[in-house]
Amino acid sequence: MKVYYDKDADLSLIKGKQITIVGYGSQGHAHAQNLKDSGCKVTVGLRKSGASWKKAEAAGLDVREVAEAVSNADIVMILLPDENIPGVYYNDVEPNIKQGATLAFAHGFNVHYNQVVPRDDLDVIMVAPKGPGHTVRSEYLKGGGVPSLIAVHQDRSGKAKDIALSYAAANGGTKGGVIETNFREETETDLFGEQAVLCGGAVELVKMGFETLTEAGYAPEMAYFECLHELKLIVDLMYEGGIANMNYSISNNAEYGEYVTGPEVINEQSREAMRAALKRIQTGEYAKMFIQEGRTNYPSMTARRRLNAAHPIEQVGGQLRDMMPWIKKNKLVDQSKN
């Protein structure tokens, strides 16, 4: 697999173009500020009534309504929640984007599942940093960058890949390394990872472990520490150096228990469930479910969110985290502000 770095990208390609970033959330604020600091001409497209307008202005960015911002752009990067992109694209972007411009995304969901069918005259690319927006920005400010993916869906100009690399470089990505993929692969692997491992799998594993201990009469506080709190310590070791690095760092007792019990808990039945989840993603069945859920204002997701919030692990966790002020001091998300 080829990895692209600074030497492989021509930053001048993007410096000569007008770029519009639609959205100013986690990724939007990072892309807009990084590209501006790289010497690019950047406009942010937002709703004037939105809370992000003043934040973008305070950062010294040119901010306009989406339709106006798009009309002057050579490159339009849409950085909105998946469910909001089709409406904004068809109402504000497609009627106003210039002939032969470049349309860019940071996730392939809407293009891959045909919720957005870009005009035939456009270059369509993806530039997807593999990290949250605050990390994309902070690494850039340190002189580094977050590894990124690029992909080309339509190449009408013959230069779409070069433009994607140039954009990634301006965003700091070629400092960390850029890997080429395609919209299908990025979308399907991203959804699978979220559903089977990172969000769905991890959350259910933590809750089930907590419930098993408390149902057996153990203190909820002990169950929280053993099944949720310490998970970060293990994940950090894997994140830093892989599974072998984690096993090197833990006790022999913990490692032996991993080998004996891990395959009993996460077993062939789990693998079959993962394969079924992947099949739903590959066939578009999951996408249809998510789109229909959105059209009915997310009744199932809202109900499950309430159930999760009411789970005993949330109550005991809140009490225990109050005993650890360093957690609040270093919070990644402050729900009172964002």
Swiss-Prot record:
Transmembrane segments annotated in the record for this chain: none
KARI N-terminal Rossmann domain boundaries: 1-181
Keyword match DNA repair: no
Catalytic reaction equation(s): (2R)-2,3-dihydroxy-3-methylbutanoate + NADP(+) = (2S)-2-acetolactate + NADPH + H(+); (2R,3R)-2,3-dihydroxy-3-methylpentanoate + NADP(+) = (S)-2-ethyl-2-hydroxy-3-oxobutanoate + NADPH + H(+)
SUPFAM superfamilies tied to this protein: 6-phosphogluconate dehydrogenase C-terminal domain-like, NAD(P)-binding Rossmann-fold domains
Active site annotation, chain numbering: H107
Function noted in UniProt: Involved in the biosynthesis of branched-chain amino acids (BCAA). Catalyzes an alkyl-migration followed by a ketol-acid reduction of (S)-2-acetolactate (S2AL) to yield (R)-2,3-dihydroxy-isovalerate. In the isomerase reaction, S2AL is rearranged via a Mg-dependent methyl migration to produce 3-hydroxy-3-methyl-2-ketobutyrate (HMKB). In the reductase reaction, this 2-ketoacid undergoes a metal-dependent reduction by NADPH to yield (R)-2,3-dihydroxy-isovalerate.
Protein name: Ketol-acid reductoisomerase (NADP(+))
Organism for this UniProt entry: Aromatoleum aromaticum (strain DSM 19018 / LMG 30748 / EbN1)
Chain's gene name: ilvC
